[in-house]
Amino acid sequence: MKPSTLILFCLAAIMPQTFHAQSTGKKVVAYVTSWTSVTPDPFVMTHINYAFGGVGSDGVSVYADGTSRMQQLVRLKNRNPNLKVLLSIGGWGRGNFSPMAGNETKRKTFAQACRAFCDRYNLDGIDIDWEFPGNNSSGETSPSNEKQNYTLLMRDLR
């Protein structure tokens, strides 16, 4: 089977499920990165998570890689008002979450910064991509209360 035929076959297999997901209330989420120029069809998914953003060097602010790219994705909501666009903060080995989450004042300030960032860029929310609370994959020691701090951060973000 030719590669192009295989790709068409795979697309044909998943497309009805994708459209069905939108009509049944299921969520179809796509991560779209700052470093690609691909613009997704806003009717194929229910949510776009823009990858990536992070916790600022001050430990409480929010930033996004390539805000112009992010705004391009937000404009897709003009074509499909039901589409939700979120900023994914963190990612593999990234985030600076632990010091912020372990401090109540910083946590609350960060939550306010997330809200302000969403308002400023017309985002529908934030995706926290913290890998992995209490089990740092980089080999560094994680604080013993990191899982609890993660829970507190989620509470404050709500």
Task: Report residues per predicted region.
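Bacterial Sec-dependent N-terminal signal peptides
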Residues: M1-Q22
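Glycan-recognition patch characteristic of GH18 chitinases/ENGases
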Residues: Q22-C118, G134-N135, S142-D156
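Mobile, glycine-rich extracellular loop/lid and propeptide segments
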Residues: I126-P133
